[in-house]
Each structure stands twice: as structure tokens, then as C-alpha cells.
């Protein structure tokens, strides 16, 4: 399972935070538990721009590997490619995670996405999240 966590600009940039908000550890834990209820044998691969925060704040109930974010800059496509190799996805309100889930070839993939993509809940996102993905 690719568990993608976006924090840096969504947390540290007041304008980004005001518009996007961010997915907290509660969402990530609930999403992980949801996938485990369907596939109890999975392992998690955490991809994030803030691995230290993830290591301190996520206690996933399955084997977990924290993937180093040394693929910044020109190597971002390698990071994205590694994400697409996962079978299932927990994504935040981030297009990077969205593209990883979208591009993954597993036809039976489970994708969990946040119910609210933006702070302003009146923004329509029905065309953003495919019907087969689970909103949480």
C-alpha cells in the first residue's frame, strides 16, 4: 500500500493551508485501517515530503517502510514511479498522490482519498475523484 503524506507547503504556507488544508494523522490511520479490513496481509510504504513527521506520528498496524524523500527535484519521476508500483493507495488532497494512484496498473486497486479535497467544502470535486475510489 502506498500511503502518501503531503505536509511541507500545505502545513507551512499559510495560503496553501487556508485553501487546501492537510490530511492529519487521524485520516491516515482510518484509511490504513480501512484497507487492512479488506486486505489484512498488506504492508505500507510511506512516501512523504516530511518523513520525520510520519515516523513520529503514524503507528500503522502492519509492516511499514518509510521511503526516503531523496528523489526531490529532477528525480521526482522516480519517486512517482515507485509509488505506482504499489497495489493499493491512501492519498492525501494532493495531485502527486492522485497521479500515482491513477497511473498504477493494478486493476483491482483500492484507493482511499479524503472526503474533502479543499477547506471550502462548497467546491465541487465530483469530477476529481473516480467513482471506484473510496472517499473517507
Where are these regions (language model features)?
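Tryptophan-centered motif/residue detector
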Residues: 27, 53-57, 98-102, 116-117, ...
Amino acid at each position: 500500500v502506498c500511503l502518501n503524506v503531503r505536509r511541507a507547503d500545505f502545513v507551512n504556507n499559510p495560503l496553501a493551508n487556508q485553501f487546501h488544508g492537510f490530511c492529519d494523522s487521524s485520516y491516515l490511520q482510518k484509511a490504513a485501517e480501512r484497507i487492512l479490513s479488506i486486505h489484512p496481509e498488506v504492508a505500507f510504504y510511506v512516501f512523504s515530503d516530511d518523513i520525520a513527521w510520519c515516523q513520529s506520528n503514524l503507528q500503522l498496524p502492519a509492516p511499514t517502510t518509510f521511503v526516503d524523500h531523496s528523489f526531490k527535484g529532477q528525480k521526482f519521476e522516480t519517486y512517482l514511479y515507485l509509488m505506482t508500483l504499489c497495489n493499493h493507495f491512501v492519498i492525501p488532497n494532493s495531485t502527486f498522490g492522485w497521479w500515482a494512484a491513477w497511473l498504477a496498473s493494478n486493476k483491482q486497486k483500492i484507493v482511499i482519498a479524503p472526503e474533502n479535497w479543499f477547506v471550502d467544502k462548497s467546491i465541487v470535486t465530483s469530477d476529481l475523484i473516480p467513482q471506484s475510489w473510496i472517499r473517507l
